Amino acid sequence: MLGKDYMLAIILVNCDDDLWGDQNLEGETGLPPGWRKIRDAAGTYYWHVPSGSTQWQRPTWELPGAEDPGRGTEGIWELRPPKGRSFSSLDSSLNRSNSLTWYSEDSYVRSLEPGAKCFAVRSLGWVEVPEEDLAPGKSSIAVNNCIQQLAQTRNRSQPHDGTWGEGQNMLMILKKDAMSLLNPLDHSLIHCQPLVHIRVWGVGSSKGRDRDFAFVAGDKDSCMLKCHVFHCDVPAKAIASALQGLCAQILSERVGVSGEAACCSPDPISPEDLPRQVELLDAVSQAAQKYEALYMGILPVTKAMGMDVLNEAIGTLTARGDRKTWVPAMLSVSDSLMTAHAIQAEAGAEEEPLWQCPVRLVTFIGVGRDPHTFGLIADLGCQSFQCAAFWCEPHAGGLSEAVQAACMVQYQKCLVASAARGKAWGAQARARLRLKRTSSMDSPGGPLPPPLLKGGAGGAGAAPRKRGVFSFLDAFRLKPSLLHMS
């Protein structure tokens, strides 16, 4: 991923393609049972649903030569594949370049509840993942290593250890709050994984691995963390995007329910009431993460978001002066504040930070065209925005993931605080009604403190609650998106 204009944040890639519509699947009269006619960018071909095989030639009906002529021809048709091609398992469709959106009969697809997504996958097995490998800056590397390890052995004949689904073709159904893995032939349940128990997920970032998807979850029987890897029939970013959207929906629904119930319950809401989309966020709130980097400087920008805006600002700062003029700094990232201090030659020396920014003011983060460069845009107020850039070794992946996790923690805190304010407002309203007061009720939620942003000029004053990280993650809450992990 590094080296491309990817943004290592929640709103990386908006998937505009209708990956899950069934308009490309056509039921045509005259086809043998189980066959579907497919039209896509590759052309028109035919798909045998039960076996997963595909062919360019239209399937034909043929009479079995050994049938009794006296029985006639009705009801004894036999399906024979074209010469030189046999009905194989799903392997053939998984390895071809054309992607099939659905892998199931039309009737079963229509029976899925609204919003459910269906994908054809093949289990490649699992690899144990140590807890420490899921820390920010390490989790993406760990998941990618698991994908590479299992993908390389995909075509080798290895004995299975009895793990559910290993080496099998499956249907992955994403709906509501669970991921279900089904047998593609009889739709029997192989495994059901609650989404709130998934620690982290990712898509293969190496060349040729864009159809490999993995997620890490705890195994209740063995009490270990397992990274399960699948090879997908569509680009794996579609699964990641669907999963991201479902988790965002769970998060917003839980907070909405908590806010409505606040008027009836005196109990305060806690972060534990919210689903844990990615538990690596917990590590960010425990202690600040520290990274050594070269502080390139700051630059005013015209917009709060956009990879083009970020790349232009990073390019300007890069061309401004020699690399020797950049200041070696220790960048501290917590769930509330990011601070860059100059690395002092003399022990015990104390100076003002080179740069400081509350996480709640961050509107956009990303890795530049050079994989060593990382930048973020902050909202200074009064429609004023500022970009800060850093040069990282060996690359900016670790820093970008840590900042992204901090933004997610801050977003969860915003949601909890919003629901808590609604609960407090309801309590005040009930109290005032009991006292029969007619005076107006003020909002219990006061303004946020003025932005603290050192290292450059910016507007002062109170910041609205929805500015900064809250608006930055609006896309995560409202529409599916992709976190492409390296």
From Swiss-Prot:
Ranges of residues in domain PID: 113-280, 285-440
Domain of life: Eukaryota
GO biological process, one term: negative regulation of apoptotic process
PROSITE patterns listed in its UniProt record: PID, WW_DOMAIN_1, WW_DOMAIN_2
Keyword vocabulary terms for this entry: Cytoplasm, Nucleus, Repeat
Residue ranges of the region described as Disordered: 438-460
Domain WW intervals: 29-61
Xref: Pfam families: PID, WW
GO molecular function annotations of the record: amyloid-beta binding; low-density lipoprotein particle receptor binding
Localization per record: Cytoplasm; Nucleus
SMART domains, per the entry: PTB, WW
Cellular component aspect of the GO annotation: actin cytoskeleton; cytosol; membrane; nuclear body
Binding partners and assembly: Interacts with APP (via intracellular domain). Interacts with APLP1 and APLP2 (via intracellular domain).
Role description: May modulate the internalization of amyloid-beta precursor protein.
Protein's UniProt name: Amyloid-beta A4 precursor protein-binding family B member 3
Organism (species): Mus musculus (Mouse)
